[in-house]
């Protein structure tokens, strides 16, 4: 948290990460602004794994709980395997009821939860997600590297859907960037690392 003064117009920013699980993404930030979202893989290497995340809260303080009880159904494709993310309350239902349907109970208070779905076909079919807050139908072929985001007010209360590697082996990496410095304010550079297992690391 040191505060430094400089007359330079740019900053050289180096990040080295050694994770306890494969790395999903690294966000490079200056204050509230995300300057870059780095992923350790390319679009061409993405596989049949779809990640569905629900997150956020109603507001800060009491009553911030957001309930995400719902289900997901596949039409024109099947689930080979489904793995929950951040399922800490084991009394909450998470069940693959058939090759085409998942049902769950979940709540968030600002963090996130969700699941990885390994599909039998990479690009076929439609994923139907139904919760009390959000209902969406998503063409599997449209799911790629960047998040498909479906908002519902509150504080970052939304569902995100994106595609992953079938097997991610990127546990450690180093990146370097140069970013311009804003002259009219303090520049607070930091990183947020998201691991595949749902854990976050902040600098």
Feature map (PLM): residue ranges:
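C-terminal functional module detector
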Residues: 1-203
């Amino acid at each position: 948290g040191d505060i430094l003064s400089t007359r330079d117009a740019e900053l050289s920013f180096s990040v080295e990460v050694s994770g306890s699980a494969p790395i999903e993404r690294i966000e490079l930030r200056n204050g509230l602004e995300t300057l870059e979202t780095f992923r350790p893989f390319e679009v061409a290497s993405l596989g049949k794994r779809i990640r569905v995340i629900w997150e956020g809260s109603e507001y800060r303080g009491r009553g911030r709980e957001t309930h995400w009880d719902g289900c997901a159904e596949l039409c024109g494709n099947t689930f080979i395997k489904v793995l929950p993310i951040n399922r800490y309350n084991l009394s909450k239902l998470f069940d693959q009821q058939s090759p085409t349907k998942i049902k769950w109970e979940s709540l968030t208070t600002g963090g996130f939860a969700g699941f990885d779905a390994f599909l039998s076909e990479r690009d076929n079919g439609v994923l139907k997600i139904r919760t009390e807050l959000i209902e969406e139908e998503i063409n599997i072929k449209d799911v790629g590297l960047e998040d498909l985001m479906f908002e519902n007010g509150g504080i970052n209360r939304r569902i995100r859907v994106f595609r992953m590697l079938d097997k991610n082996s990127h546990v450690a990496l180093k990146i370097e960037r140069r970013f311009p410095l804003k002259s009219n304010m303090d520049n607070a550079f930091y990183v947020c690392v998201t691991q595949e297992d749902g854990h976050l690391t902040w600098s």
